[in-house]
Amino acid sequence: MAVSVLRLTVVLGLLVLFLTCYADDKPDKPDDKPDDSGKDPKPDFPKFLSLLGTEIIENAVEFILRSMSRSTGFMEFDDNEGKHSSK
């Protein structure tokens, strides 16, 4: 039970990280500054965070799926062992 709660917490935390990295929040331009439509500012730092968040999520999903497949393999082994002992 504790492991499933821990996994759920990790997944929810990564989901929040994922959503915050991909959020499309553009600040409103102040009225007192002129519109610089000719300039194209590069938001390198948010793109870096986005890529970092994507890598973290991919690695976490891979780890969770790998650990779940390992635990499923152990359960199948336990079930097979139980069948042999009942004969």
Swiss-Prot record:
<dbReference type="InterPro" id="IPR027950">
    <property type="entry name" value="DUF4576"/>
</dbReference>
<protein>
    <recommendedName>
        <fullName>Uncharacterized protein C5orf46</fullName>
    </recommendedName>
</protein>
<keyword id="KW-0964">Secreted</keyword>
<feature type="region of interest" description="Disordered">
    <location>
        <begin position="24"/>
        <end position="44"/>
    </location>
</feature>
<dbReference type="GO" id="GO:0070062">
    <property type="term" value="C:extracellular exosome"/>
</dbReference>
<dbReference type="Pfam" id="PF15144">
    <property type="entry name" value="DUF4576"/>
</dbReference>
<keyword id="KW-0732">Signal</keyword>
<feature type="signal peptide">
    <location>
        <begin position="1"/>
        <end position="23"/>
    </location>
</feature>
